[in-house]
Amino acid sequence: MKILISCSATALLSFILFFSTPVTHAGSVKGKELFERRCTGCHRLDEVRSGPRLRGIFGRKSGSDPSFPYSTGMKSLRITWDESTLDKWLTDPESLVPDNDMAFRMSDAAERAEIIAYLKSLSAH
């Protein structure tokens, strides 16, 4: 009987923990998949490639990661990366920094939001 109660309690706790996961986490899972598919040609989370590393980008000043050789335009932009600035950047980088090196654009607002939520979730840790 004690084993049955223990197993039932474990199952109930697992059920509660699984279904109490915040909705933002679900978005982050899709965002991670989109990030890996759409962004990792140039970016990594923790290492520099042809683009800067992106873990911790939320709250970071533009052009401020010392491990990446930013353009003069990006260094002089002086914005802080948040949902709004990242959305503008991913929509049309040229509108924020003319003659930048990022030739990539994302027209799908839902995909941008998922990737931004994913990057934000990584910056919160």
Spans of model-derived segments:
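Positively charged n-region of N-terminal signal peptides that target proteins for export
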Residues: 1-4
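Bacterial N-terminal signal peptides
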Residues: 9-19
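Cleavable N-terminal signal peptides
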Residues: 12-13, 23-25, 29
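Sequence/structural segment immediately N-terminal to covalent heme-attachment motifs in c-type
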Residues: 27-49, 54
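Solvent-exposed, acidic/flexible segments
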Residues: 28, 32, 47, 79, ...
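Short glycine/threonine-rich turn/loop motifs
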Residues: 28, 52-72
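Short Fe-S-cluster ligation motifs
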Residues: 67-87
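C-terminal capping alpha-helices of c-type cytochrome domains
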Residues: 82-125
